[in-house]
């Protein structure tokens, strides 16, 4: 089964999380969620993240990049200001890049790529 990881934090831009979350499920991905705060949070517009109340949240410290095929980094300026300060998340992004796995960014999610220093000599 294909596995995707969405990394985010409090005040993510709601639709930038919700749309890829449900589209990946529709495409039969197993979708895991890693949240900077390691707990359910709210999107900037008030949506519960993750939206399904029983959807598990992975502990950031325990995520193994080898378990995933795809990484999604949704935006939300307020969220990314905090998430990009989490050294573990930045290391995870660097490892996804090192293993040449697909990384999808939406809007200000690209800030995480900059913090992980994986944008040099690339078109974003």
Please report, for each region that a protein language model flagged, where it lies by residue.
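Catalytic nucleophile serine of serine hydrolases
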Residues: 107
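Anionic-ligand binding patches
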Residues: 124
């Amino acid at each position: 089964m294909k596995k995707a990881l969405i990394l985010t934090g409090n005040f993510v831009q709601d639709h930038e999380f919700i749309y890829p979350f449900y589209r990946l499920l529709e495409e039969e991905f197993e979708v895991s969620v890693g949240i900077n705060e390691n707990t359910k949070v709210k999107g900037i517009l008030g949506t519960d993240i993750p939206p399904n109340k029983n959807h598990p949240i992975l502990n950031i410290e325990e995520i193994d990049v080898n378990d995933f095929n795809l990484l999604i980094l949704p935006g939300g300026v307020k969220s990314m200001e905090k998430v990009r300060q989490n050294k573990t998340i930045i290391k995870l992004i660097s490892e996804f890049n090192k293993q040449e796995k697909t990384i999808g960014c939406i809007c200000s999610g690209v800030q995480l790529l900059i913090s992980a220093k994986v944008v040099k000599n690339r078109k974003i």
